[in-house]
Amino acid sequence: LTDDHKSLLLNIAPGTYQLQIYAENIGRITYGPEILDNSKGLFGAISLNGAAIENWKMIPLLVRETSVNELTFGDKKEGDSPCFHKGTFEMNTPKDCHISIKGWGMGELWVNGEYLGAYWEENATQSVEVPASVLKQGKNEVVLFELKNNSQRSVSLSDKPVYK
């Protein structure tokens, strides 16, 4: 859903379902006249076939506090977003480096269970810094929580920051 497209049509068979909606809140306006109308989230009645849904709850998704070591990973289909991705890379001698997120959308990144920061395709910087202290000789694990682009399948390492 967007500011311009405020409804969602679901074609599903009759039954009992649980609907989960993720509302991201990045990108607040910090200048100009729009600063007065800079709300994020769901507004107004939430309805199904014109009838208001009641007793629904909103909870924060505290992904930055998530212990990625406790997650279970499975196969993902195109369009399964948001979702977590996990991969590994080898490093002979741990040193400061950057993980390029070119081709990814927006999300959060961990290396060896250590949260390193957020990334967004709209930013000039297209990489996340990885300090040598987080890395190990041999196999290292990278986890991404991707909000937009589930079709991407790889990241790359760079000695320098990556820019648009």
What are these language model-derived features?
Residues 1-16, 28-29, 96, 115-139:
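A cross-kingdom feature marking solvent-exposed beta-strand/loop segments within repeated
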Residues 128-164:
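Terminal leader/tail segments of proteins
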